[in-house]
Amino acid sequence: MGTTLDVSRAELALVVMYLNKAEARDKLCRAIQYGSKFLSGGQPGTAQNVDKSTSLARKVFRLFKFVNDLHGLISPVPKGTPLPLVLLGKSKNALLSTFLFLDQIVWLGRSGIYKNKERAELLGRISLFCWMGSSVCTTLVEVGEMGRLSSSMKKIEKGLKNGNKYQDEDYRAKLKKSNERSLALIKSAMDIVVAAGLLQLAPTKITPRVTGAFGFITSIISCYQLLPTRPKIKTP
C-alpha cells in the first residue's frame, strides 16, 4: 500500500513539476492551437475560433522571451565546435530572438493597443520568415552535430574491438544524445513546413490542414522533450 502511494505521489509530483514550466504550458497550448487548425481546415467555425484565440493567448507567454536567445547569442560556445556550426547556431539565436521580439508587436496589434494594423501584419510576416530561418539553421546544426556524434561513436567502436559497445557508458551516452538530436532534427524540419504554411508560400500543397497536422506533431515532440526525468522509487 505504501509503495503504491509513493509511486502515485511521485507521478503527481512530476505532473506538477511539468505544468509549473511556462514553456511546457506554452507547448500544450500550441498543441491545442494547431490541433484546432487541423480540425478547422481553414474554415470558419468553433475550431478556427479556438485556433485564433489560443494563438493570441500564447503570445502573452512569450513576452520578453527574446532575451533568452539574446543571451544565447552572446554566450560562448563549447570548445572544439566547428566554425560553420558556430555561425549557424548564432544565426539561429539572432533570428529566433528577432521573431520573438516582433511577435510582441503583433500581439499589441491584435489586442488593439498598437493601432497601425497594416504595419503589424507586415511585421507579423517578417517575424514568421525569421522563425522559418531559425528552423532552417537549427536543422543544419542538428545534421552537423549528428555527423560529429556519429564520427566519435565509430571511434569508440574501433577502440572496443570485440567488446559490447552497448556496455560502454560513453557510447551509450553518445547514442542517447544522437537519438535526442534526431528527434530535434525531425521537429525543426517539420517546423519549416509549418512556417511555410503560415506564410502561405505554397497554399495548394501546404494547406491549413497540413499546417495544423505538422504543427500538432511538433508541439507533441516539444512536450515530450520537456518531460522531467522520472525519479527512481526505492523498493523495500
UniProtKB/Swiss-Prot annotation:
Induction trigger: Up-regulated during senescence.
TM helices/strands, residue ranges: 93-109, 208-227
Superkingdom of the organism of origin: Eukaryota
Gene Ontology BP, a term: regulation of peroxisome size
MF annotations from Gene Ontology: identical protein binding
Tissues and organs where the protein is expressed, per its UniProt entry: Expressed in developing siliques.
Segments on the Lumenal face: 110-207
Side of membrane Cytoplasmic, spans: 2-92, 228-236
Major location (coarse): membrane
Intracellular or extracellular location(s): Peroxisome membrane
Entry-annotated residues carrying N-acetylglycine: 2
GO cellular component terms attached to this protein's record: chloroplast; cytosol; mitochondrion; peroxisomal membrane; peroxisome
Pfam families on file: PEX11
InterPro entries assigned to the protein according to its UniProt record, in alphabetical order: PEX11
Position of the signal peptide: none
Its membrane topology: Multi-pass membrane protein
Alphabetically ordered keywords of this record: Acetylation, Membrane, Peroxisome, Peroxisome biogenesis, Transmembrane, Transmembrane helix
Function of the protein: Involved in peroxisomal proliferation. Promotes peroxisomal duplication, aggregation or elongation without fission.
PANTHER family tied to this protein: PEROXISOMAL BIOGENESIS FACTOR 11, PEROXISOMAL MEMBRANE PROTEIN 11C-RELATED
Family label: Belongs to the peroxin-11 family.
Subunit structure: Homooligomer. Interacts with ARC5 and FIS1B on peroxisomes.
Annotated protein name in UniProt: Peroxisomal membrane protein 11D
Organism in which the protein naturally occurs: Arabidopsis thaliana (Mouse-ear cress)
